[in-house]
Amino acid sequence: LGGRKKHKLGENNSPLSLGTMVVGSNAIPIPRVSLSLSEVHLLKIHSNPIKIKGGLSHGWLDKGIYTKAPLLHEKWLYFSYEQENYSGHLGLVHEAVWGGATETFGSQPTSSEDFFRVFFLLGGSGASTSKEQTNALGNHLGMWDLGVRIKKANYNYHVYLQHPFEDQSGARWLLNYPDGLWGLSIQSQNKKAKMTDFLVELLYTMHQSGSEEVSDSTYGWDDYYNNYLYRGGWVYEGNVIGNPMFTLGQNEIRNWPHIVNNRIMALHTGVKGFISKNVEYKMWVTYSKNYGNYHDKDRSNRRGIDYQFDSGLTQLSYRVDLTTYKWFPQKNIATTLS
């Protein structure tokens, strides 16, 4: 399968959600070729199936601030277990930006051997930068995705966590253990109820494997969605590829577009239902405290520059969508407040 196609990775598929932690619908689709494995039965435990699904993609990112556009490597693998009234899933999503060229570091290696190194998160060859040789070739990020679904009475419940990682050190779970998108979704089996769906999510990305000052410099300051080499960030065509709560911008510390805000505490709720037989509503409310990122804060303090996120910036956003089906089938009338 190839070309531009809507592509999202993550099991939090409610339209009320903030979005996934790695690949969502905030940016337009990235051109790619993909191979995927549809959900198939792997084995059975007490007559209940364990299923597996996954995929592999090769993509082409935009040139942006680079002198040559970098490449995208992507793979994902999910396991699920089902019983009559509940199921569980565990998945791993891995993304890597590699190749391309920058003004500062020049052309990056793209041989078949280099692809092998990117695939297995191995250090780079002598043709790569010193940091790539000691850590891993390319900019690596991803998430662990786990959750449980329960059917009880007239409702379906989904409890989930998407835990992000950045580079090799972040992939070790306990180093940034509090960070992630924590969620609860409740869906009524009555599709015309006054409230058919309710969702609450907590986005927390404050830890990032800790402060670099109290580490041995082999981890810390994960700086989600940013990278020293691919400094444009986890972005495609000017939009964040992952969760839209992460803010793209620039400042006098790093005077190029990058993720200026990735240390976030946000509480998000969504409600969906029917006001009447033919009028559906959706409502979202998000409250967040935003603390910028470790790197910009540290450099601002060392230069004696006021840092705009020092005390945390507060944001409260609302959105209400109304859809009528009687006179104009699936005609949307939307009201947005923020």
Language model features by range: what are they?
Residues 1, 33-39, 77-83, 146-150, ...:
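Residues on the lipid-exposed face of transmembrane beta-strands in outer-membrane beta-barrel proteins
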Residues 1, 40-52, 80-89, 150-156, ...:
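Short loop/turn motifs that connect adjacent beta-strands in outer-membrane beta-barrel proteins
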Residues 1-73, 81-99:
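Outer membrane beta-barrel
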Residues 2, 54-56, 88-92, 157-161, ...:
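Membrane-embedded beta-strand positions of outer-membrane beta-barrel proteins
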Residues 6-9, 39, 58-64, 83, ...:
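Transmembrane beta-strands of outer-membrane beta-barrel pores
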Residues 27-36, 69-75, 82, 140-144, ...:
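Residues that define the transmembrane beta-barrel architecture of outer-membrane proteins
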Residues 90, 100-218:
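Long, internal scaffold/assembly segments composed of regular secondary structure
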Residues 209-300:
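C-terminal structural cap/anchor segments
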